[in-house]
From Swiss-Prot:
The keyword tRNA-binding does not apply. One of its GO terms (biological process) is proteolysis involved in protein catabolic process. Gene3D superfamilies: 1.10.8.60, ClpX chaperone, C4-type zinc finger domain (6.20.220.10), P-loop containing nucleotide triphosphate hydrolases (3.40.50.300). This is ATP-dependent Clp protease ATP-binding subunit ClpX. The gene is clpX. ATP-dependent specificity component of the Clp protease. It directs the protease to specific substrates. Can perform chaperone functions in the absence of ClpP.
Amino acid sequence: MSRFDEKKQLKCSFCGKSQDQVRRLIAGPNVYICDECIELCQEIIQEEFDESIDLDLMDLPKPSEIKDILDQYVIGQEKAKKALAVAVYNHYKRINVEDVKSGDVELQKSNILMLGPTGSGKTLLAQTLAKIINVPFAIADATSLTEAGYVGEDVENILLKLIQAADYDIERAEKGIIYIDEVDKIARKSENPSITRDVSGEGVQQALLKILEGTVASVPPQGGRKHPHQEFIQIDTTNILFIVGGAFDGIDSIIQKRTSKKSMGFGAEIESKQVLDLGSLLKQIQPEDLLKFGLIPEFVGRLPVVVTLEQLDEEALIKILTEPKNALTKQYKRLFEIDGVHLEIEEEALRLIAKKAIERKTGARGLRGIVEGIMMDTMYEIPSRDDIEKVIITAEAITENKEPKILLKEDVKPKLDKKENEESVS
C-alpha cells in the first residue's frame, strides 16, 4: 500500500523517505520506490551475481570431463585434447586458489602454443574450451598486428575484443581466453637479429611479451591507435589464458634436419632419409626448432605448454562430416528439413568429399566449401518448389560434377502406399 503523511505527501514504501528527500520516486500499483532503494537493490543483486560467478569457477570440470566434452565436438587429436584439458584445468585451478603466493610457491601462468596443419582443429579446440569453462573468448589474427606507431593494429586491440566478448565486464574479461591465430606469420624473417626494423614480425612478438606474461594494459575503448587525450580501459592480463596457434609451414624440415644422423669420413653412416609424416615430426619439436623458425627466445619462453596436432586422414574427415554434435551433414540435413525435404548422403560420396579435402590440403576447414559447391544449385531450387521429397548426394555428384539426385513426392508416395499394402496383407 502506498504511504502518505498527514499532508498526503508521497513517501517511499521501503525506506519511508518523502518525495522531497529523494531525487526520484517511481510509482507502482499502490506502492512507491525511491532511486536510493533502487540503487541499494542493484548492489545486492550484483553481489549475489559476483558470488555465483566465483562459485562457477570453483566448480571447474576435471581434465577427463573437459576431454569428454571436447570429444563431442572434435574428432581425433587425442593427445592434443588431453594436453589442452590438463593445461586449462591447471590454469583455472591457479586462479581459484585464494592466495597464489601461499608460502614460497608462486603459481605462474602457462600459456599454450598449438602447432598443426591447416584445418586440423586448432581454432575449434580453443573455442570449445572457452564454452566448457564458460568464460569470455576472443580470436585475433596475428597477421593484422604491427608494432606500436606503425600502420596496422596495436596488440591492445586483442584485449578490446575480449572485453567486448565479456560485455565490457572487466572482471570477467580478466579470466577469459584469447586465441591468437597465424602466429607463425609473425616469425622474424631470419634467425639472426636484423638491423632493419621488422614491425610485423619480431616487433609484434616484442609487443606481445608483456600481455602474455601479465601486465595492466591500457586499452582504447573504441579500438584503433592510442592518443594522449583519450580515456583508457585498464585490464590486468595476469589471469587471461593465451592460446597461440599456427601451421608453421616448413618447421618439419627444421626438425628433420636436427633429428637426422650426420657423420663424416670413410666409415661414416649415410644420413638417414627416413620420411616421417608431419604429425610424427611435430611431436619431436624442441624450443630450438621454434627459434630457428623465427620466434624470439623471450616469446617461446612465455609459451611453456606446446601442443601438436596431427594431419587429419580420410577416416577422420569422414567422422568429422558425420559424428560431432554440430557435424556438417547434420547441419545440412536440418537446413533441408526446414524446407520439408529429406537429405541423404551416400557413404561413397562422403569418402570422395574427404579425399577432395586431402587433395586440396585444406583439412576439415575445406569440407564445407566442397559440400556447398555440390549442393549450391539444389539449395537454390528447393525453396521455390514444393514437389521435392528427397535429395540424394551420390558419388557421381563429386566425381562427374552431376547434380544430386532429386526424388519427387509423386514418385515416392506410390512406393510407400504399395509397401504399406503389402505389410497389411502379410
